[in-house]
Amino acid sequence: MNVSAVLASGRRRSMSRSADPGTSRRLGDQALVLGGSLAGLLSASVLARYFDRVVIVERDQLSSQLGGTRRGVPQGRHSHGLLVSGSQSMERLLPGLTDGLVARGAIRGDLIGRARWCFGDVEQARFDSGLEGLLASRPLIEDEIRRRVMDLSNVVLIGGYDIAGLAVSDDRRRVLGARVVLRKPREEAGSTSTGAASAGLPTDSIDEDVMLADLVVDATGRGSRAATWLAELGYPAVREDVVDARMSYVTRRFRQQPGVLDDLDADVIGSGPGGVRGGVALRQEDGTWTVSLAGGFGERPPSELTQFQAFARSLPTPGVAEIALRCEPVGEPQFFHYPGSRWLRWEKLADRPERFTVIGDAVCSFNPVYGQGMSSAALQAEALARVLDQGLSNLPARAAKAFAAVAATPWTLATGADRRHPSQPAKPLVERVLDGYLDRLLVAAQHDRELTMAFNRVLNLLAAPPSLLAPRLVARVLRPARWRRQTLVAAASPAPRLGGDVGVLLEARSIPLDS
C-alpha cells in the first residue's frame, strides 16, 4: 500500500480564518471527516475551530446546484422538518443559518399553534407556544449548511471517494487517517477533482491512498463500517440495540391550495401501540405539501393515488386525507423501507483506538417519522465541541459517552410506540405503570397548557424526560377531571391508544443543551 503524506502541504499551511477561532484552542494540524452528511458538515464546522485544516470526504458526487438528493440519504425526498432543539442548535453552530433558510423559502412557525399533533386517539390542543420549528426539504437544509461550512476557509470537501478503511499505527492503538479510493476517473468526477487536487489527492487514478489526520470522525451514517474496521484490528465487537417495527413509507407531494389547512403548517398523526398506521403532512419551501404515510409491522402504504387517499382517510384526524383528496398531486410517489431503529453502543466499548470517533446515524438512527435525526446530529455536533474543549486525550471514550447522552431521549421516543406493539416482548411492571401515566398526561394536556408545554419540551429535545415527573405536573395529571382547571377548551377524547416507552423515557439521561 502506498502510504503517502498526501496532505503534507496542507499540514504546513496555516489557514487565515476558521469557525469562531477566538473561542477554541488549537488541537492539531488536520482533522478528517468521513461523510458529507448533515452530521459530517456540522462536525466539520466544529472541528474548524480546533484544527488548521478540516477535510470532508464524501462518497457521493456533490453538485453545486440545489435540487438533487444524495444517494446516501434515501429518505431525503420524504417529509422533513427541524425540531426546536435542532433549529436552535444549528443556529448556534452556524449563526445566520435560520434566516438563510427562511430567505430561501423555509417555513418558520409555532410547533403547537401551527401544527396539529395526534397521538393514538388523543389530539393535542393548539395554542401559540413560542416553540418555533422550521420546515424545509432535506436538500435545501443540507445545501444551505454545506454552503456555510464551505465558506470556512480551512474546510475542504471532496466527493467521489470510497473509504477503504482506517490507517493505524504499528501497534494499532492510534488511528492515523483513512485509506481512500477514487471512484471515478478525473474526466468523470466533475467538480470533485478540484477539491481533491486542493487536498493533495490523486484525481486520475483508482489507486488506494492514505489521508493523514490528527483526528478522524466517522459520519458515514447508518452504513458506517467503523465497527467492522475495529473488529478487523482486534478490538471488541460493538453492542447493537435494534427495534425493528418493519416500517414502510410512501411520500407524495401535493400543490398547496387556498382553503386547505390554511391555519396549519404541519399535521402529524402517530399510531397507538396496537396500531400500525400513521401519517404526516408538512409545508415545504416550493409551495407543496409533502404527505408521508407510514405502515408498520408488515403493513405497506400504497403508492397509487386513490389507494393512497383511502389509506389517509383511515387515519384518526382528517387533515392528511384532506390534502391528498383536495390538492393537486405533483411528481411521482417515493417509497422508503426503514430497516429499524438501531443504536450502536459505542459508549460501552471496553477498548478502542485513539483519535477516532463516530457521530450521527453511525451511532444511532431513528424511525424517521419522528423527525429527530437532524436535530440529534446537531446536538451531537455541539457535544463534540464540549469534548474537544477538554483536548484529545481519551477523546473516543469521552465522545462516545457524550453522544450517547444526546441519543438517549430521541431513541426512547422513537422506539417507544414500537415496543408497545403486541408482537414485542412484554415490558416490566414499572414501565407499564409509567406508560399509563404518560397516557393520562396526554389526555389531561388537552385541557392544560402547562402539561402540553412540558410534553412538547421533551418531544422537541429541550427538556429531559424525567421533567415530566415534576411534582406539580404529577399533581395536574392525577387531579380528577372535574377539579382540573380548564385552561383550554377541548372535546372529551375516547380512551387513548398511545405509544411511548415511558419506563425508559422517564429514566433517560438529561441532555446538556446549553452548556
Where are the model-predicted features located?
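A short, basic/flexible loop-to-alpha-helix module at the beginning of a structural domain
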Residues: 3-29
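C-terminal helical "tail/cap" subdomain of flavin- and related membrane-associated enzymes
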Residues: 7, 385-515
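N-terminal Rossmann-like FAD-binding beta1-loop-alpha1 element of flavoenzymes
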Residues: 26-57
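N-terminal FAD cofactor-binding segment of flavoenzymes
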Residues: 46, 66-116
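Short beta-strand to alpha-helix junction loop
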Residues: 81-82, 128-147, 219, 225, ...
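Helix-loop-beta segment of a Rossmann-like dinucleotide-binding subdomain
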Residues: 119-138, 175-177, 189, 294-296
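Predominantly flavin-linked oxidoreductase catalytic cores and closely associated redox partners
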Residues: 151-311, 315
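FAD/FMN-dependent oxidoreductases across multiple families
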Residues: 299-383, 387-410
